[in-house]
């Protein structure tokens, strides 16, 4: 029984952990001033705009390409918005009249 007389009987103690012990958590401050938040939001928006200008790492060709894409997209939108649904249906029916019977499908009606 002499071999078991030196046995640790309590919980194990790890080096360095006993020094830390249980610490209380710090409470978060909930009473932040709304004016400070609004001011911070305003400055953050300005900072984002400045960063966009400063961090534009596109080549001039890339910038021109994207600008032209936006321009073409706007042209497509305006072109589609210029006609009413009735006009589109009439144009489609005219197109169907010019096709041969191989592509024959019934005419589309805009009223039912």
Swiss-Prot record:
Annotated source species: Homo sapiens (Human)
Output a single Gene Ontology CC term carried by this record: nucleolus
Which tissue types show expression of this protein? Expressed in ovary, with isoform 1 being predominant.
| Keyword check for Calcium | no
Put simply, this protein is called: Protein FAM32A
Q: Which family is this protein grouped under?
A: Belongs to the FAM32 family.
Q: Which residue ranges have biased composition labelled Basic and acidic residues?
A: 45-58
Gene Ontology process terms (BP): apoptotic process
Induction behaviour: By etoposide, puromycin or carboplatin.
Keyword Lyase in the entry? The reply is: no
Q: Name one GO molecular function term.
A: RNA binding
Q: Which key words are in the record?
A: Apoptosis, Cell cycle, Nucleus
Q: Where is this region: Disordered?
A: 23-58
What the protein does comes down to: Isoform 1, but not isoform 2 or isoform 3, may induce G2 arrest and apoptosis. May also increase cell sensitivity to apoptotic stimuli.
